From Swiss-Prot:
Gene Ontology BP annotations: isopentenyl diphosphate biosynthetic process, methylerythritol 4-phosphate pathway involved in terpenoid biosynthetic process
Binding site for NADPH: 10-13, 36-37, 124, 126, 215
GO molecular function annotation: 1-deoxy-D-xylulose-5-phosphate reductoisomerase activity; manganese ion binding; NADPH binding
InterPro entries: DXP_reductoisomerase, DXP_reductoisomerase_C, DXP_reductoisomerase_N, DXPR_C, DXPR_C_sf, NAD(P)-bd_dom_sf
Origin species: Aeromonas salmonicida (strain A449)
Keywords: Isoprene biosynthesis, Manganese, Metal-binding, NADP, Oxidoreductase
SUPFAM superfamilies noted in UniProt: 1-deoxy-D-xylulose-5-phosphate reductoisomerase, C-terminal domain (SSF69055), Glyceraldehyde-3-phosphate dehydrogenase-like, C-terminal domain (SSF55347), NAD(P)-binding Rossmann-fold domains (SSF51735)
Gene: dxr
Protein name: 1-deoxy-D-xylulose 5-phosphate reductoisomerase
Lineage, opening ranks: Bacteria, Pseudomonadati, Pseudomonadota, Gammaproteobacteria, Aeromonadales
Catalytic activity: 2-C-methyl-D-erythritol 4-phosphate + NADP(+) = 1-deoxy-D-xylulose 5-phosphate + NADPH + H(+)
Annotated disulfide bonds: none
Amino acid sequence: MHNLVILGASGSIGQSTLKVLRRNPGRWQVLALTAARSVDAMVRDCLEFSPRFAVMVDEAAATALAGQLKTHGSATRVLSGQAALCEVAAHPDAHSVMAAIVGAAGLAPTMAAVRAGKRILLANKEALVMSGAFFMEAVREHGAELLPIDSEHNAIFQCLPEAIQRQPGYCDLAGAGISRILLTGSGGPFRYTDINALAQVTPAQAIAHPNWSMGAKISVDSATMINKGLEYIEARWLFNAAPEQIQVVIHPQSVIHSMVQYKDGSVMAQLGNPDMCTPIAHALAYPARVESGVEPLDFFSVGEFSFIRPDYERYPCLALAMSACQQGQAATTALNAANEEAVAAFLAERIGFMDIARVNEATMVALGSSPVGSLDDLIALDGAARARAHNLIEELS
């Protein structure tokens, strides 16, 4: 049986992964589930899936989980801390690792899985945004297999020739007859909102995505469209694409998840209802296909497809991310760190919606040209960018 580790089991992607497993009993064995501090969810899922290991980042949460599992007679071994995350991600019995921890916190365990040569189901886009070339070099050096979970990158992956699928990060798009990648995005909940009203947007409004059901952080990222900017950077590394080979297209219906345009004029697109269970099922079973539980697309009810050019005045964070991709690794690392801090401050109602872009830009300008020669340099830069962003947030609060 295929052993699976789910990093970030209590989050949106982790829960969708478990949903796909329920649709396909007996195909995968859950080796480990991890979470930060969601004890109740972990008790429920450990009792259902009987993993060998359960890891809580928070030590008090681990103690609480261990006590409750013991009461239920569970044999699951409970571990705690960042080192334990890395340990289960690289466990000799693990075949695939779902990397679904949100943000920079997911980099270390994801990299541990890469260095152990695992099949990585990559939902943590920040790992690539933060570490780019270092991450892809580790994938190649250690023989890891990389399968994208983001709906857009999974769609692009499915539209590429099999030879390209087998060597992400080191493929030759032009040599395979590909002219460009068309990266689609819904435009978020404010694509038609008066620009002058965006400063008054509340967290509750920002997390109400019109098409997708997602966590709070990624919902805000979608509203600012920095999510699409981070995906632009991720696509650059995943598919060895030059920035000019990637075009962002706003597609409000969220039915076409992305496209690949070939030099002969053909365009390959991957379509489906907006549900993360589809790309998760694809990556879990690749190259086979399994039930995802997602309703088949009904073309007659969709009605129409529309496409809009991005408005960078409305979406300054998207422009910042694309600029960071041109600048290089330090800029993307600084931007990602600043954005995590800024979004957390916005959700806590400490800064306004448009302040997110201000914090991101000021941090990127200050630190985006820092020298980075190693992963340790990137981690240090991440910390410096967070400190800088924190100071800016204090000034704006």
